[in-house]
Amino acid sequence: MGFFRILFSLSLCALSLAIPSKLIGLENTKDVIPNSYIVVMKSAVSEAEFQSHQAWASKIHSRSLGKRDGVLDDFGGLKATFQFEGLKGYSGAFDKKTIELITRNPAVDYVEVDRVVKLDAISTQRDAPSWGLGRISHRRVGSADYVFDDSAGSGITIYGVDTGIDIRHPEFGGRAAWGTNTVDDEDTDQNGHGTHTAGTFGGATYGIAKKANIVAVKVLNAQGTGTTSGVIQGIQWCTDHAGRNGLRGKAAMNLSLGIRGSTIFNRVAEAAQASGIFLAVAAGNDGTDAGQFSPASARGVCTAAATNSQDAATSWSNYGSVVAVYGPGADIVSAYPNDDTATLSGTSMASPHVCGVGAYLMALEGIGPDTVCDRIKQLASESVTNQKPNTTKKLLYNGSGA
């Protein structure tokens, strides 16, 4: 399914006994990145204190390496910082003694282990017909026509935080630009997932917000893998870019990825939403409660579950009270790298439908990111079948009147 997951691997029993309780994320045991951590500072820490703490952390890291005769191994030290309103911290690779000292530092709120981001299995069918656009612009099943206002997301910028985007694809007509890359040195989409999601939220043929500007933010590589800390860096870049370019209040972000139970991921998503960017996120493809995943369970984001062409919730879509709305997610055709198309399935496909409608409504109605998800829920059709208990029946609708 088209959904990215951040999970754990490696036994951490000995580590959990040695390091204070402020180190979180030890309850899972799949795909942890050895010796890699995300350090979150207490909210009262000033900028000067944050800088001082970084210098201190680098010093004790160097001292620890000195005791190891300068052997670097996997301990590269402080790698990147992040700062949102009321939330700051850094990521890095540290040995056991160093991370124990960092965790005990009174300026530190908590430390979370870093994890690998993976691409779930994707089903691909070349050049198949799509149905999602017709479905979100009609109250009833069956129409192949997409009915929409000509504003079509004009003036809104959408950040695709994913595997990158083939910005030269004809679907984007020069509206797509490269933003940043936190995972490798290849500034293109070598996987296809990111181009596909961008085609859904903003493509000329397969997209919803056909006049929106699109920015590629690559956080996952050709194999569909990255890190929690890398995704945080990507989101940080988006909020900074929106601030520098006067886009806060006129921007949306698609996150077709997730992690099981991450405090820091939820907080970063909430901070990005609060900064003036509408966030649409995938519920996940585990057929379980989306409340167990982040950022699906973050406050204020618009979490999307998936339906098929007959309005039935798919068996693999996550569900639960955190789901805001269902969107088309099975057999969705969209753009693919090298001027191609592909058909993919997953909540990764439902999320860009929600993101695209969010951008469309922001342009059409002049509403802000903080009210977009409520407006989406208000417009939605109560037509989803086969959904699990404690889950909405709301199906995405753009308000076209058809």
From Swiss-Prot:
Its EC number is 3.4.21.-. GO terms for cellular component: extracellular region. InterPro entries: PCSK9_ProteinaseK-like, Peptidase_S8/S53_dom, Peptidase_S8/S53_dom_sf, Peptidase_S8_Ser-AS, Peptidase_S8_subtilisin-like, Peptidase_S8_subtilisin-rel, S8pro/Inhibitor_I9, S8pro/Inhibitor_I9_sf. Residues 36-119 form the Inhibitor I9 domain. The keyword Lipid biosynthesis does not apply. The active site is at D162, H193, S348. Its main location: secreted. SUPFAM superfamilies: Protease propeptides/inhibitors, Subtilisin-like. One of its GO terms (biological process) is proteolysis. Residues 1-18 form the signal peptide. Glycans are attached at N254, N390, N398. Residues 19-120 form a propeptide. One of its GO terms (molecular function) is serine-type endopeptidase activity. Residues 130-402 form the Peptidase S8 domain. Secreted subtilisin-like serine protease with keratinolytic activity that contributes to pathogenicity. This is Subtilisin-like protease 9. It comes from Arthroderma gypseum (strain ATCC MYA-4604 / CBS 118893). The lineage of its organism: Eukaryota, Fungi, Dikarya, Ascomycota, Pezizomycotina.
